[in-house]
Every structure is written in structure tokens, then in C-alpha cells.
Amino acid sequence: MGVILKLCHWWMIALWVVMMVYWAIAALFVKRGGDRSALRRGMRMRLLLFVVIIATMVFLRRSSSFHALQWAVFQSVPLAVTGAAFVTVGAALAFTARAAIGRNWGSPAVRKSDTELVTSGPYKVIRHPIYSGLLLMMTGTSIGLSPAWWFVVILASLYFLRSARSEEEFMTERFPEAYPAYRARTKMLVPFLI
């Protein structure tokens, strides 16, 4: 039991590390352009979100009642396996979506004039598969590792919804005929639902 639990935990952590390294490297090859002040505002928002998340995680980690709850309730093999499965599916979705969008990927705050409408790969079914993949990864981590991640899932969901709406406004302006048609036949985050 202990070995499976540890393997699941290390698998989830390893996927997060691979995701961060891949994203950092892939960011070097995106199209440049757009409003730099918007990029700075977006970066400030992400930094604030990151600081709040880390502060909350540190606070919860130091809380003895939280720590006891975490180990009593959330450290089971079925939950760890379920969490690892969610993280794996989420990572696969995010990687596939990132590959499909290619050089068009970038910060939601940067509105590039040479943006292309990508409707292939996972974008054929959902409009924001990277956000969906990351939310699946966060949900899996909260199920398999720690309930503190639920706070992260809630904050990230709010941020992703805000970013998705902003991106959709831009894409509607950029592709006034094609994007509304694409939007009508796809869902925002969850195929056939949302």
C-alpha cells in the first residue's frame, strides 16, 4: 500500500515538473508581438495569484489540524490512483493542445496581430483545452495529494474563466465570422457540457 501511494505521489509531482519545464522551453518559440503593457498587467496578475496560492499552501502546511486531516482522510491508495489518473489525462490534454496551437500560444494578455484560429486537435472539441488540462491536473493533485489544492483549483478556475472570456473577445474581433461559428459548435472547457 505504501509503495503504490508513493509511486502515485511521485508520478504526479514528476508530471508537474515536466509540464513546467516544457512550458518554459516552449515559451521561447512563440510568436512575438502584441501590447507589452498588457503583458506586464497579465504577469502581475499571475504573480499575485501565485503569491496568494503559495502563502495559503504554507499556512495550511503549518496548520496541525489540517495536517492531521490530510493524512487521515486524503492519503489512501484509491484516491492516489484516481488523482494520478486525472493528472495524467490532464497533462496529456495540455501537452496535446500546446502542440496543436504551436507558435500561436502566448499570454492571454498579449493580443498578437498574426494570431491564427486553431481548430484542430483538442481544439476541435473544446476552445480552451490547455486550461481544461491544467484544471484536470490540479483536480487530480487535490484528490491524490492534498486537499489544499482545492483552493488552487478554485482560484485557477476563476482566473482561467476570466482569461478564456478575454481571449474569446479578442478572437471574435480578430475572426468576426469564423470564431462565432467555431464557438457555436464547441464548448469552452468540457466537451459536450461547458
What are these regions (language model features)?
Residues 115-126, 130-131:
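Solvent-exposed interhelical
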Residues 1-112, 116-119, 137-194:
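Membrane-anchoring alpha-helices and their flanking helix-loop junctions
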